[in-house]
Structures are given as C-alpha cells and as structure tokens.
Amino acid sequence: MSQEGFDKLKASCINSGLCVECGACELVCPKGAIKLQKYQWGRNPELSGSCGDQYCDKCFRVCPARSIPLSKIEKTFFGRTRKHCFPGKAGDFPTPNGEDKCGIYRNVYTGFALDKEIHENAVSGGITSALLIYALEHNIIDGAVLAGFDPATPYEAKAFVATTREDILRGAGSKYQPHPQLLGLRDAIKMGLKKIAITSTPCNALALRKMMLDDDFKEFTSCIKLIISNICGAHWSRHGTEWLITNGLNVRLEDVAELKYRARPFPGDFKVKLKSGKDAEAPFVNSLLGALGRFTPEECRVCLEKVASVADIVVGDTWHHPVLSPPLLMAYTDEEAAKDERIAYARKGMTAVVIRSEVGEEIFNAALSGQAIRAFKDSPEEARAFLEAVHDEGKPLCNGPVIEARIRRGQPVREYF
C-alpha cells in the first residue's frame, strides 16, 4: 500500500496544527480512504482504509493549510495579479500601499434584501440569502451548499444542500464553528446538480480555488458557479458553543431543539429554542462573543485570511466601516442620519459586500437590477478605508506575532506564491 501522499498531508498540514477541517482531502480521495474523525476538540483527517498501490497525493495538493498559488488564482479568476507585492510566508506583514491588505476587488457595497422575510431572517442585511434565492429563481444556479446544523445534534454545524427558497432561508445566518463544508459539494454532485453556489469561510475558499486550478479535480469543480465567503475573524470549536449553551444560558444540551447565534434584532442575540417550545437567549455580539475567544482552535490562530482574498463575493457586517460601523450608528444625531440614508438602514442591519470577480459582479448586478436587493456603493476612499481597517484591526494584530514565532522556531505556516 502506498500512502506517501497522505503521509505528506499528515506531516505538513495536520500534525503541524494547520488543518482547517474543510473536508477537501476526504472529498477528493479516490479510494475514499480519508475520513474526518470527530472529537470534542474538533475533527481530524485520518486514514480509515487503503490508499491503494499507486502513488497519489491528491489530498495534499488540495489542502489550503500550507501552500497557496495566489498569483495563479488571481490571474485565473480575477484577470490579473495584485499590484505591488503579496504575502510570502503568512507572517509577512503587508505593505501600507497597493493591494496587499485588500486584495483584488472591483467594488465595495453596503446593502440589504428588499424581501422582508429574507431580511428579517438574516444576521444583518440578508444579502447572501437574497443573491442565492435570486440566482436559484433565475436559473443561474440549481442549488447551493450552505452551512446549517446537524438534525441529530442541533448545535453542531454541518453542510447541507439547498435547492429551494425555503432551504436557503433555513441556512441563513453565521455558524461560528469549523466544519467540513466542502463535503456538501459531494452531496450536491450526488444529487445531480450542475450549477452550484457554495458559501464558505476564507480558508475553505482557498481549497476550492486550488481544486479549480487542477484538471484532476474537474469532477468536483466544473459545476461550481459562485463562491461566497464571509469576513472571518475566527471560528470557535464546537465545545465553545456547548459551553455557551450550558453556562451562558443554563440549558442542558439534550434539551436543545434549535440554535441561532445571532437572532434578531440586529446585531443579534444568542438564542436556543428548547424541545419544550420555550426560548432561552442572551446578547451575543456585546456579551457572549467575547467568551468564545477562549475556544479559538489552533489553525485560526495562525491565519491572516480575514477578507476572503479568493472568493467571488465577500460578505460581512459593517464593523470598521468609516461611516456605518455599529458603534457609530447609535451616536449619530437625527440631523446627521437624515443626511445619509444609509445610516437608518444600517441600524436595522446591512451587509458589507466586497465584489472581487467578474462572475460575482454579474450576479450581484443582476440581483440589483431585479430589485432583489438595495445597495449603496462605497466611494473609493470608503472602500479602501473599510478594507484596510478590517485587515489592520483583525488577524495581523492578534495572529501576526503567533505566526512570526512559528517561523522563528522553524514551524510551518501557510505560504503564498
């Protein structure tokens, strides 16, 4: 039996603490020999069968933990590479000029779904749900891989395939847990879907782009029409969510019927529906979110991918926006708010949207023209200020020293070339 490819993956990506639990290795293994085994602290790719007699390194080639051909990804999917330099080792701090901090982007917007049901069901503006429903109803896609919860364990994140408006609404809202989102792509293909949108974290999007560059993975990637990623500060291990339920809400896990990390009103409450029909909830963004930081997994502590540099469309809250950041919204006077209609809308929840690719721009503009969404285009100065602030106030500040320490000690980090 030859398992040299998996041995490379294990040594370089798994045992190094860099595995992001995306599921790409399990997805592409031609022998079905890799399984993400579940533990309390997370999932771990492990051999559950034979790799076969022939050399195969597909699992290693798709992994987003170590090696990212950023220049080739940008040239292929965005039409050019970013100006000036780009990160080499992930501990290299970007230069203050050029596109190092922001990546390649076409435009930045803030907006919300015009459909009241979609907006009220969302974390902020409902743009992701609105775009996917529009694309589905106009035959741009025939399904979407979304993050939901496992019916058997309703507080555990799990990928699922949405093929109806109702499915998409069921998948609305952030799921703050690492989970093998890319295994949902396998399910979508088995269902016979040919035009698939997939939502993912920035690190999962790296795996998708690596697969899309390699003809060996066409069976998985030829059907991908759109990648939407979220602005990501970190995800937190499942036992962090369990702690919030049992300690933050004083609810037994076996009593949980449904979970929302950020139920309305904006910016959102941590809400659990009990099997008894009762609800238990507490403020999330301004309270419980801080407690989750203690449960940040190792791989998130060595990541700088906050604004999803390789996705078609990036979505998130308006934190760090020069005009619409939530701390600013409540400080405006009525007179100030009357001068900028964005403020009133943002107080009810708006999504920040970064358009990176032509594909993303076409779908976004179609939904805008089709009155599925309302959007306000940031000025070039606002767009730049927003993206730089998201970058500067996030992962480089917290994770940069950790990454530099790993480099100094000869430990592997994610590298871009």
Each predicted region: which residue ranges?
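Iron-sulfur cluster-binding cysteine motifs and their immediate structural context
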Residues: 2-6, 16-18, 24-44, 56-88, ...
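Gly/Ser/Thr-rich loops at beta-strand to alpha-helix junctions
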Residues: 123-127, 151, 198-208, 234-236
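Long, compositionally biased charged/polar accessory segments in the mid-to-C-terminal portions
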Residues: 141-142, 249-417
